[in-house]
């Protein structure tokens, strides 16, 4: 059965569906020696190339969806390549699978990061329309009043549009530094930090502790990873109608 080429590429673990669509628009994908166009369909037996390199659309066709959780350490980058030679999260993943990262964390943020071999699942989980909770533990320097909490939950206009926390709860701490637990439903760059900074607060630590119903295991050490249980994977698939 034929399917849209971007879906086949995502299912084969080469990248998300959106990533494949960008390559199609750039003329970098061919099907049976013909330049692919958006909307083109293919089957896994077709000869498909990316930048002239033949890819295997069927390599994961019979493989079950896997999801991996990594406890990212601050200072580790979410990229495969780095001119400065810094450590990458991909150095800590099992090498037997083509992993697609679900969103990313900035350099100084630690905590829960998901990877999957199902590009379609990754794309759905990242898309803003899915409105999936992302919970963070954040240590804030400064005296936070109730009026600040109201502004953060009502919403603030940032340089890239309106943003807000869907929930803010006090997490403890003494003196000038206090911990809070906050929830956002988008994956915008540095969104949590920028919301606090908009009210002149400084974020001294930021840890992602939850994505959807998946929580960061307490015993999972920095830069260690573990597979989600099949029941958890099925719940993730169901949450985005896959």
Where are these predicted regions, by residue range?
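Basic, flexible Lys/Arg- and Gly-enriched helix-loop patches that mediate nucleic-acid binding at interfaces
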Residues: 1-242
């Amino acid at each position: 059965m034929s399917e849209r080429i971007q879906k086949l590429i995502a299912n084969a673990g080469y990248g998300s569906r959106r990533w494949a669509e960008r390559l199609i628009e750039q003329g970098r994908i061919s099907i049976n020696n013909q330049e692919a166009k958006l909307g083109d369909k293919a089957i896994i037996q077709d000869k498909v190339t990316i930048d002239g390199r033949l890819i295997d659309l069927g390599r994961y066709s019979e493989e079950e969806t896997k999801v991996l959780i990594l406890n990212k350490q601050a200072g580790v980058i979410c990229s495969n390549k780095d001119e400065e030679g810094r450590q990458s999260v991909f150095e800590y993943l099992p090498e037997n699978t083509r992993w697609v990262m679900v969103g990313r964390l900035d350099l100084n943020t630690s905590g829960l990061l998901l990877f999957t071999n199902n590009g379609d699942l990754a794309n759905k989980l990242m898309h803003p329309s899915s409105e999936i909770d992302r919970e963070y533990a954040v240590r804030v320097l400064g005296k936070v009043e109730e009026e600040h909490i109201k502004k953060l939950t009502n919403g603030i206009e940032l340089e890239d549009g309106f943003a807000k926390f869907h929930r803010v709860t006090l997490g403890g701490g003494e003196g000038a530094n206090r911990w809070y637990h906050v929830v956002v439903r988008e994956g915008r760059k540095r969104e949590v930090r920028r919301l606090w900074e908009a009210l002149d607060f400084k974020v001294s630590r930021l840890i992602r502790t939850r994505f959807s119903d998946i929580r960061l295991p307490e015993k999972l050490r920095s830069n260690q990873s573990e597979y989600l249980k099949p029941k958890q994977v099925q719940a993730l698939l169901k949450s985005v109608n896959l």
